């Protein structure tokens, strides 16, 4: 079993609520986007949606901090905004209804690219098809992708794991 799988199982065991489980996974994904070389070269910061609204909302005329399924927002070196939804669904299949609010809430002109990060590789066909030809585009980062991270989760100094 991989270090990441062990960590996800630890989160599952030690968190008391689904909300805590989700928040722990979101915090892990902040570190993933800031430390995984592919993303670390692209992003200057990754913020919770509420913190992003606090920092950039006035400039974009956004006052509502309700996230509508957006958990995090990554800010590119060029100043673009990429919303991220984090799904910690270890044993559950992701259905279209699980991502509908994110797709609606993140389909704004100030977002140029979107991510859904999931701790599963199991998606319904309807969920997969809802991402095709979406605008802005949506990329998925699956458990398999996370497992293939270049971050050494077995190292003594663990930036995210």
Please annotate each region the language model reported.
Residues 21-110, 119-129:
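Catalytic centers of nucleases
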Residues 4-16, 49, 53-62, 100, ...:
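ATP-dependent helicase/translocase motor core
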Residues 1-23, 27-31:
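Glycine/serine-rich loop-strand microenvironments at binding/catalytic pocket rims
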């Amino acid at each position: 079993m991989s270090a990441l799988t062990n960590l996800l199982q630890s989160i599952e065991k030690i968190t008391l609520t689904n909300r805590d489980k989700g928040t722990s996974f979101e915090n892990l994904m902040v570190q993933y986007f800031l430390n995984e070389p592919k993303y670390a070269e692209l992003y200057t910061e990754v913020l919770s949606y509420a913190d992003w609204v606090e920092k950039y909302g006035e400039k974009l005329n956004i006052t509502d901090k309700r996230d509508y399924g957006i958990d995090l927002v990554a800010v590119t070196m060029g100043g673009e905004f990429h919303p991220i939804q984090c799904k910690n669904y270890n044993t559950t299949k992701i259905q279209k209804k699980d991502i509908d609010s994110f797709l609606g809430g993140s389909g704004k002109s100030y977002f140029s690219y979107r991510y859904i990060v999931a701790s599963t590789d199991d998606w319904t066909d309807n969920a997969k098809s809802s991402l095709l030809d979406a605008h802005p585009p949506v990329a998925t980062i699956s458990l398999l992708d996370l497992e293939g991270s270049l971050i050494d989760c077995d190292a003594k100094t663990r930036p995210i794991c």
